[in-house]
Amino acid sequence: MSSIKETLEIIKRGADEVLIEEELIKKLQKHKPLIIKFGCDPTAPDIHLGHTVVINKLKQLQDLGHKIHFLIGDFTAQIGDPTGKNATRPPLTAEEVAANAETYTKQVFKILDKDKTIIRRNGDWFNKMSASEMIKLASKSTVARMLERDDFSKRYKGGQSISIHEFLYPLVQGYDSVAMNADIELGGTDQKFNLLMGRELQKQQGQEPQVIITMPLLEGLDGVKKMSKSSQNYIGIEEPANEIFGKIMSISDEFMWRYYELLSFKSLENIAKLKQDVAAGANPRDIKIELAKELIERFHSKEDAESAHQDFIQRFQKNQIPDDINVVELNQELPIANLLKEAGLVASTSEANRMIQQGAVKIDGEKLSDAKIIFAKGTNNVFQVGKRKFAKIIIK
């Protein structure tokens, strides 16, 4: 086990909040492995880089000697987490949940040590709970307390329906912490209300309340919206190595550091040195290559990482980018079609959309397929339309 100071530094790196740090120190002073809880509802089978922000933190705590209890919400997935939703989420069948859970855990073990991870399912206790016990659990909170949640409040004020079972979700998730006697629970910043509910229920049950560690939500490739499949701005960890490499290379030079902070296992000192190198004139592309190779090596292999790098170099060089490439500087974020028009690469947005559909638009040598992607400030990439039109576009 590392020292308390070292453990705190690792825990706090990249974290949004630690609630409550003094309580965490007291737990660490016991010098025994802590029960670290992380729960997920397997509502989809695939993991993307956004999910790995929390899982990476679990791995760090696992390496420090703590016990990772990875909770599969096979019961709660059939309720549907209302967090951040503007409408009632459709429930999944037990069969869908089981299939998703199987592939989800398989991918999780690309990061966590399987032999040191305890997999639990909340159906083990909730499927045995009687109706009277569930009603007793529901009595542990109030409607007023639930309406403190931003998403519930907005729906209520907007006249949108909120089902009773959605009010139960935070209580059910919170009770998981009681059943597991968790010392620490990790989650995204959007889960804070639910995590706090776990603390409240533990106190009511006479348990020492869990410490909460919230991790930031990773923005997607557009640098704006939260990474998600629905926004088509994600990188799946099971995508081919070449795809991962190309997508990492497509992020802006400025936004690259956000990915380093939340996804890389490099030390903060090492990352600071890379920033100094770029400030001194090093090519940001080379730094992005380092990140792409690190991630591919983690999810695939070192050989795949090197192969993807060589493939990228070959394809990029084949584009024969002219030495006198036109540099276009813009000062506002723009959808791809408008961006190409402003840069003079197309005559109209309709032409831009047509070229994208035809697969004739590339960014740093990677074919673009999403006609709805928006490029934010910090963009610094080479755009190609057809075989001969090039422009380096910078958004300040």
Swiss-Prot record:
InterPro entries: aa-tRNA-synth_I_CS (IPR001412), aa-tRNA-synth_Ic (IPR002305), Rossmann-like_a/b/a_fold (IPR014729), S4_RNA-bd (IPR002942), S4_RNA-bd_sf (IPR036986), Tyr-tRNA-ligase (IPR002307), Tyr-tRNA-ligase_bac-type (IPR024088), Tyr-tRNA-ligase_bac_2 (IPR024108). GO terms for biological process: tyrosyl-tRNA aminoacylation. GO terms for molecular function: ATP binding; RNA binding; tyrosine-tRNA ligase activity. Its EC number is 6.1.1.1. A motif ('KMSKS' region) lies at residues 226-230. It catalyses: tRNA(Tyr) + L-tyrosine + ATP = L-tyrosyl-tRNA(Tyr) + AMP + diphosphate + H(+). Keywords: Aminoacyl-tRNA synthetase, ATP-binding, Cytoplasm, Ligase, Nucleotide-binding, Protein biosynthesis, RNA-binding. It is found in: Cytoplasm. It holds the Pfam family S4. GO terms for cellular component: cytosol. A motif ('HIGH' region) lies at residues 42-51. Residues 334-395 form the S4 RNA-binding domain. Its main location: cytoplasm. ATP binds at residue 229. It comes from the Bacteria. Homodimer. Catalyzes the attachment of tyrosine to tRNA(Tyr) in a two-step reaction: tyrosine is first activated by ATP to form Tyr-AMP and then transferred to the acceptor end of tRNA(Tyr). Belongs to the class-I aminoacyl-tRNA synthetase family. TyrS type 2 subfamily. NCBIfam families: tyrS. This is Tyrosine--tRNA ligase. The gene is tyrS.
